[in-house]
């Protein structure tokens, strides 16, 4: 019996390029081979290098998790579904750009989900609740009070009128 529930968790693009990797076994070089195989394979669960490999295809992104052969497969499948729901809750639209934009939150989500290959949280809402909230993402996400926005608009308008003289 192996202590690990999970040997590795990968976030890859549809070509198999790894965007994020968290490996808990000594065989780290296998991660790239697993990502490449999962990108070319259409199955959601398979066996590769004596490991159970589970893959979720989300638009341009693949979530890949691999475990030892003697792991409780239904348990890993269920917590992987929950992790996938939490992942989608963070990135909203699973594209390569969104993964890079939300990379810090993905790292924190994986840390909440797994500790040294052992599943720590099996519910997506619990994982999301424990993540720190971002105040905003750039100027687009900033909440500006209505009165201040009106004042700023009037000030900009009056300054632009004054500069044309």
From Swiss-Prot:
GO terms for cellular component: COPI-coated vesicle membrane; Golgi membrane. Coiled coil: none annotated. SUPFAM superfamilies: SNARE-like. It is a peripheral membrane protein. Its main location: cytoplasm. Keywords: Cytoplasm, Cytoplasmic vesicle, ER-Golgi transport, Golgi apparatus, Membrane, Protein transport, Transport. Oligomeric complex that consists of at least the alpha, beta, beta', gamma, delta, epsilon and zeta subunits. This is Coatomer subunit zeta.
């Amino acid at each position: 019996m192996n202590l690990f529930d999970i040997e590795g968790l990968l976030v890859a693009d549809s070509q198999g390029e790894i965007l994020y990797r968290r490996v808990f076994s000594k065989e780290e070089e296998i991660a790239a081979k697993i990502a490449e195989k999962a990108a070319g394979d259409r199955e959601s669960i398979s066996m590769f290098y004596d490991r159970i490999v589970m893959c979720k295809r989300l638009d341009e992104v693949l979530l890949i998790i691999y475990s030892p052969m003697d792991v409780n497969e239904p348990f890993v499948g269920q917590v992987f579904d929950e992790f996938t729901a939490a992942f989608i809750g963070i990135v909203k639209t699973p594209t390569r750009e969104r993964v890079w934009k939300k990379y810090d939150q993905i790292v924190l989500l994986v840390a909440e989900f797994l500790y040294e290959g052992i599943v720590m949280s099996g519910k997506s809402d619990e994982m999301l609740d424990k993540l720190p909230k971002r105040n905003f993402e750039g100027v687009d996400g900033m909440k500006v009070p209505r009165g201040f926005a009106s004042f700023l608009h009037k000030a900009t308008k009056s300054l632009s009128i004054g500069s044309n003289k």
